[in-house]
Amino acid sequence: MLRDLFVKKKKYAAIPSEQVRKDVPDGVMTKCPKCKKIMYTKELLKNLKVCVNCGYHHPMNAWERLDSILDEGSFREYDKEMVSLNPLEFPGYEEKLESDRKKTELNEAVVTGEGTIDDMLVVVAVMDSRFRMGSMGSVVGEKIARAVEKAYDLQVPFIIFTASGGARMQEGILSLMQMAKTSVALKKHSNAGGLFISVMTHPTTGGVSASFASLGDYNLAEPGALIGFAGRRVIEQTVREKLPEDFQTAEFLLEHGQLDAVVHRDDMRESLRKILEVHQGGEMAVWQS
């Protein structure tokens, strides 16, 4: 009828067909979990995995992190073949380890080695949260302790990038022992005048935050990183108080004196270079036997 021409029609959202969705290959687009903007993955990678819209720092894997801070081609890996066993015979643990090895092409949740930043030699460790959520087991602790000892032997600074859910429950007390072992190694390095820079990324929690991650001569963090020991809900239930919205964020810790700086990923390499340059030939570089 003619009358129907003037009736306001309902608007419906166009739903892409299954064929249209299939035409976009996996991995081409990435959705930011903070601002929900969808962007080309290639664009995100070019921007060091920082959202171009809101500045959210997406997680980096170990190799991406190393590429972003070290001189090209300078990295030499340590202890690549070390793998975790199942000393407590925890059900399903070996299968989970093997699954993560295939998924990440890593043998463990940390990559250690040496490289240069603007031709200054450093020993570096980078935790990778894709492997068992970056949890600290006996091999993770051993690799970090060995890396610190190598920095001590070479008389060069040690830098670590942390990203971890804490101690690995499948290894029980063997996991908790790594808190003491890594701390003792760092104390020896410090007593000899060695420089240690800790960079906490999202998330750095549990036994990792309560040990080596917080022991740096410089404690840095990326914007928005979650840093803390116990979870927010556990703390609120214990103290029976509502915690601030920004509690356990890098910015909150900086405001309360627990960090030296919050450094944007774009500025991380330059910030590390400046710190290393300050300590070249300075008091921290005077090694003691």
Curated annotation (Swiss-Prot):
It catalyses: N(6)-carboxybiotinyl-L-lysyl-[protein] + acetyl-CoA = N(6)-biotinyl-L-lysyl-[protein] + malonyl-CoA. It holds the Pfam family Zn_ribbon_ACC. GO terms for cellular component: acetyl-CoA carboxylase complex. One of its GO terms (molecular function) is carboxyl- or carbamoyltransferase activity. It is found in: Cytoplasm. A zinc finger (C4-type) spans 32-54. Its cofactor is Zn(2+). Residues 28-289 form the CoA carboxyltransferase N-terminal domain. The keyword ATP-binding applies. Pathway: Lipid metabolism; malonyl-CoA biosynthesis; malonyl-CoA from acetyl-CoA: step 1/1. Binds 1 zinc ion per subunit. Keywords: ATP-binding, Cytoplasm, Fatty acid biosynthesis, Fatty acid metabolism, Lipid biosynthesis, Lipid metabolism, Metal-binding, Nucleotide-binding, Transferase, Zinc, Zinc-finger. It is an enzyme of class 2 (transferase). The keyword Transferase applies. Its EC number is 2.1.3.15. Zn(2+) binds at residues 32, 35, 51, 54. One of its GO terms (biological process) is malonyl-CoA biosynthetic process. Belongs to the AccD/PCCB family. Component of the acetyl coenzyme A carboxylase (ACC) complex. Biotin carboxylase (BC) catalyzes the carboxylation of biotin on its carrier protein (BCCP) and then the CO(2) group is transferred by the transcarboxylase to acetyl-CoA to form malonyl-CoA. Acetyl-CoA carboxylase is a heterohexamer composed of biotin carboxyl carrier protein (AccB), biotin carboxylase (AccC) and two subunits each of ACCase subunit alpha (AccA) and ACCase subunit beta (AccD). This is Acetyl-coenzyme A carboxylase carboxyl transferase subunit beta. It comes from Bacillus cereus (strain ATCC 10987 / NRS 248). The gene is accD.
